[in-house]
């Protein structure tokens, strides 16, 4: 075989290989590919590749798809995901997630279609190692010289950086332990990559990433050296425990520094309840939006229910919540079929170098799948693309080591210009769908800049453009409503309040799971009721405000603000009993919410119950004394009545 390091890269690659390499190299470069710009670029590259494949095939009157047993479970999973759009409460977001899944399948197709030789497999291995070396070196530099508490490379989350580096490290280790043909330069490169990437995993200080890394290198060692490799695992674990290192220090400190650090058990229990409540799933991407009804308390925090689990911190549970038991089963089926295909590839008589490549690729897949049990790694495009790349390369390697290339599945379609036009329209529609959120984000960002300069009219114009670009975005609607309220405060023109209420009503219709728009709508109705021009509608507006707060409570039952505002309305109407009930419900969830306790004390005084009033006042003093000297967030200040609750 040609030397792994020094083989010459040809002057040109096929278009699919260039697209695969471009996506792989670019994906982690901007915060792991999670923000709007990199997501858009990745999507457009993949859509361009899809369009090219379709047009080329239609011009030849044949669409060819590489054979693999994985297509049926992939198509089944995608089909179920598409079907879930029917019952998703927030279709716009679910549609974007479905597009992501579809393009991951396109990426898989591109790899199987383009990687048709051992040299190309090796070049992509080199790309993975080079990216790991670059990211690892950057992360180590950040930690040692730039004052970062945790290495993170170009990722926004050190945990995801840890996964990326662990994949690179186990691939390099597997090639070292199995390889015999790489020469001195090749071995030095692999040793350097393994060392840099392993060090980066430690400096990232990710508990889940470290566990996944140890699991993977144990598997690699066991396959290569048998049970004796378990001794190496024991040495690594003991070294981590006995000798000072950043990972050990974080494991010791994290519980005292972050009251939310050990809440994963509660989050998983919460996710299990969601699956029980919605066995068919709630829709793609809906986990965080349904979190308002599934908050859980953190007793040591001022705001007990202040945190919402926006992810399950276990991707398999999250799949079950969003796509139901059936969706999770289809995803597990993909893993099982892939595993069966790898078993068919593995043979004791495989060349040792091929064994090293196959084991390294499978270990990289294992890293991501194991880390997915404790973190949200499937939400990071760079990690998912790397997972798909390694999984597909392992399948492609199987075709090479068998010595035969299975004939692709061909679909004959007589050439017709209309088919090409329809394909272009379909790909163009997907591109439009991909561009929508990025365009809205860009336009809204311009609006934010104008708002920061107090140019609210320009800000409104930018947000209106954003609402045209992406009509399904509730964030844009909410931003518009806030700007309209700001314009009302400046001008006193009550028509701005009417426009704000209209935008929030649209937001509620787009996403009925979010408890914030109905609460804000209620506060706007109260502002409208205060305007002289609407004096004759005051009772009606107050009733609408009360209904809005009730809607807020039904969607977000753990937030005290809806109860507080509703209680004030009841109290204003003289209904002290109802007011007392909702104030007491507020403090039953949030005992540190002083505004509700103050209201209860005042109600007790009005009812001639001084002992009850004194009890509430004493509780208020105790709460303030307990948290005296704390650095308070804006929300905590509202709870402790340092500042008034905001609308």
Where in this protein do the model-derived segments appear?
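Helix-loop-helix junctions and helix-breaking kinks within/between transmembrane helices
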Residues: 31-42, 91-92, 156-159, 190-221, ...
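A membrane-periplasm/extracellular boundary helix in multi-pass inner-membrane enzymes
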Residues: 38, 142-146, 195, 199-205, ...
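Membrane-interface segments at transmembrane-helix junctions in multi-pass inner-membrane proteins
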Residues: 143-177, 205-208, 315-319
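Transmembrane signal-anchor hairpin modules in multi-pass inner-membrane enzymes, especially those
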Residues: 1-83, 89-130, 175-189, 221-235, ...
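Hydrophobic transmembrane alpha-helices and their immediate junctions
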Residues: 325-359
